[in-house]
């Protein structure tokens, strides 16, 4: 069974997906279930009657959510499956013959950047015969100031749209999902074919060393991982450091100034190198 995280990981780097399956990262201890608190507050924002809601849990059989569609007006964190993909749906509300779908976001102005997640949820629901009438986001309110107990009415904003870099509503959520070219089924078919072969070869992409370095970087590129401290490959937040390295600019002091982002930290590293 796949999760949306598996699909996103495979899309980013098939090798990363296989390496993490073999060597999963340690899970940090969870002293506070933050997601539970957010879900409870969001449920109060949506005015969900406790007697009319089905609440899903980890490990639920897929039949539980399908049965709940026939007996409840609200579904919260219900687990649905389609093909080999299992998803957790934040909130569903029965509205006539269709359902309203609500996503939660901890962003103040959620952008349209994680569309594979949204599309995967919608795809699984559609495969289960769920007709979706409306899709909205519940995101945090920038102007909210807490006084005493959290106030869900003021804490959350309901929006039909994603936001741009200037915090203005842009593309409607439903339209953004419809325009997303990622196909969950096609990705899973590629994953199934890849599972029949050995771990893919290492291919360098911008995800290998962006603002953070992939934890398998040394395994994929052992020679680069052993580079000296003054190597151009150690330049912080640089999208072009590998290209410079491949073009013979091996050391920090050899950096092409027109090929760097020009941050103060980069200049300091170049001067020190």
Describe each model-derived feature in a short phrase:
Residues 40, 44, 119, 123-126, ...:
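A broad, structural surface signal
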Residues 80-185:
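Nucleic-acid nuclease catalytic cores
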Residues 22-26, 46-51, 128-132, 220-227:
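Short helix-capping/linker segments at secondary-structure and domain boundaries
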Residues 26-34, 134-141, 225-237:
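Short alpha-helical "patches" and their helix-cap loops
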